[in-house]
């Protein structure tokens, strides 16, 4: 008799705990989480981005980083334009450098720099020509300057391009 009450009490407690545990996973979805307006898109082509800045070879850096980010997300297959469902076109609008820290002896000498790259993109359906998604994305990176300024600047631009590419990939594959 005492054992039955004890077991019933434990059963009730375990039932309540399991119900609470199951409710916490109600919004979780396994598998692909594409936005609803992009459900029919399975492959994307990414032509080289247009570069409106004066920074040479920036378009190849950002385009390659974007292709890599889309491939890593696994949502879309990257293919040639004639074989893809949509095309991701983009224009690099601005690249800005901002001093975050200076040396103690000379405020004009930069110690830490922030590089920002701004891109306007559009995802267009290859069959209908309809714009499926568009927007502006900004990628940032902060970096300490080394004695080799050119190398440090190039590495910081690569990291800013990677951040930008991750944001573009998240926007077209997850909707935010």
Language model: regions and residue ranges:
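A generic short-segment signal for beta-strand/edge and adjacent turn/coil regions
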Residues: 12-15, 47, 55-62, 84-92, ...
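Sec-dependent bacterial lipoprotein signal peptides
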Residues: 1-25
């Amino acid at each position: 008799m005492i054992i039955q009450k004890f077991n019933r009490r434990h059963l009730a407690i375990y039932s309540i705990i399991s119900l609470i545990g199951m409710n916490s996973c109600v919004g979780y979805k396994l598998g692909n989480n594409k936005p609803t307006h992009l459900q029919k898109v399975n492959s994307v082509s990414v032509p080289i981005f247009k570069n409106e800045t004066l920074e040479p070879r920036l378009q190849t850096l950002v385009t390659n980083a974007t292709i890599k980010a889309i491939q890593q997300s696994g949502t879309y297959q990257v293919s040639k334009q004639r074989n893809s469902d949509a095309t991701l076109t983009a224009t690099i609008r601005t690249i800005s450098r901002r001093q975050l820290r200076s040396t103690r002896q000379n405020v004009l000498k930069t110690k830490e720099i922030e590089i920002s790259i701004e891109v306007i993109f559009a995802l267009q359906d290859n069959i209908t020509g309809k714009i499926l998604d568009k927007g502006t994305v900004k990628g940032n990176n902060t970096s300490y300057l080394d004695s080799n300024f050119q190398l440090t600047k190039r590495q910081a631009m690569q990291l800013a391009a990677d951040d930008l590419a991750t944001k573009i990939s998240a926007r077209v594959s997850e909707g935010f």
